[in-house]
Regions:
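Glycine-rich, flexible loop/turn motifs
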Residues: 94, 160, 196
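Surface-exposed acidic, glycine/proline-enriched linker/cap segments
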Residues: 155-165, 169, 175
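Domain-scale signature associated with acetyltransferase and cell-envelope carbohydrate enzymes
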Residues: 1-140, 167-168, 186, 202, ...
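Histidine/lysine/aspartate-rich catalytic loop segments that bind and position anionic ligands
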Residues: 128-161
């Protein structure tokens, strides 16, 4: 299947493939079954229809799923990667998913890379600057259901909600779960497959289920 795109100078990016870049300039890209690059006008339609505010040079690969009943604010120079072929074909997930309830709030800084990441907020989830998140990672600020079994399918007012904060320069590996109330300190790394349920110290590596301290990272 082929798709015709209009080349847009504002959406330049480095693919490491000169032929790919030349095809962009010629306005013709060939992909199999999935759109892997969205031009600026199409991107604006997706975000604007969902009430999402965003900065400059936001690049989308594939089509993100957005359900915004609260507030979603994206920074500048971001990449939302949902494609399963083309750029960064290591993506193993179904794509970027951003969802807020009426009370939910998602805010990101600049240079944040979401690679098939799901962010679900009923309270507040804040991401700083220069953050990389691997495929299939889920970030939530709520239990989703009550703990007592009689209330799990009802009494939504009793669900526990706590803000999540991810500070600058954090790298989160693939297939991680970041749970309610978590604070991940500046410059830290979360190993692939980890479940984070508490506070992560700055400039540290945490891994496991639940994630535990592995070692410190030297500050430059």
């Amino acid at each position: 299947m082929s798709f015709l795109f209009k080349y847009n100078e504002k959406l330049k990016f480095d693919t490491g493939n000169e032929n790919y870049y030349e095809l962009m300039k010629d306005g013709l890209l060939h992909f199999s079954k999935v759109i892997t690059f969205i031009t600026s006008p199409f991107l604006k339609v997706i975000l604007n229809l969902n009430g999402v505010s965003y900065g400059k040079n936001v690049t989308v690969f594939g089509i993100p799923r957005i359900e915004n009943k609260g507030s979603i604010k994206l920074g500048s120079n971001m990449r939302l990667i949902s494609a399963k072929c083309g750029y960064n074909s290591g993506n193993l997930s179904g794509g970027v998913f951003l969802r807020t309830s009426k009370s939910g709030k998602i805010t990101t800084g600049d240079e944040v890379y979401l690679n098939g990441t799901s962010i679900i907020s009923e309270e507040e989830i804040t991401l700083g600057n220069r953050i990389m998140i691997g495929a299939n990672t889920v970030i939530m600020d709520t239990n989703s259901h009550n703990v007592p079994y009689k209330d799990r399918l009802k009494r939504w007012d009793k669900i526990i909600r706590k803000p999540v904060k991810i500070e600058d320069d954090v790298w989160i590996g693939a297939n991680c779960f970041i749970m309610k109330g978590v604070i991940i300190g500046k410059g830290s790394i979360i190993g692939a497959g980890s479940v984070v349920i508490g506070e992560v110290k700055p400039y540290s590596i945490y891994a496991g289920n639940p994630a535990v301290f592995v070692k410190a990272i030297e500050e430059e």
